[in-house]
């Protein structure tokens, strides 16, 4: 699996997803339901592209990355 993508591409992709998320919440969907669907969509796409084992290996690293604050949007980075 690719280790990195250009920061601009990641930022743009995240912006598209967050815009769709905001629209879904506005339409009345529960954020937990959106999150579950987003995780399923992301993982199923990655499995189709890379296979189950590489995706499972990537997912096994998620707890440490979460605890390190990598997914905390409110954090300040310098």
Locate predicted features:
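Solvent-exposed interaction surfaces and binding hotspots enriched for charged
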Residues: 1-78
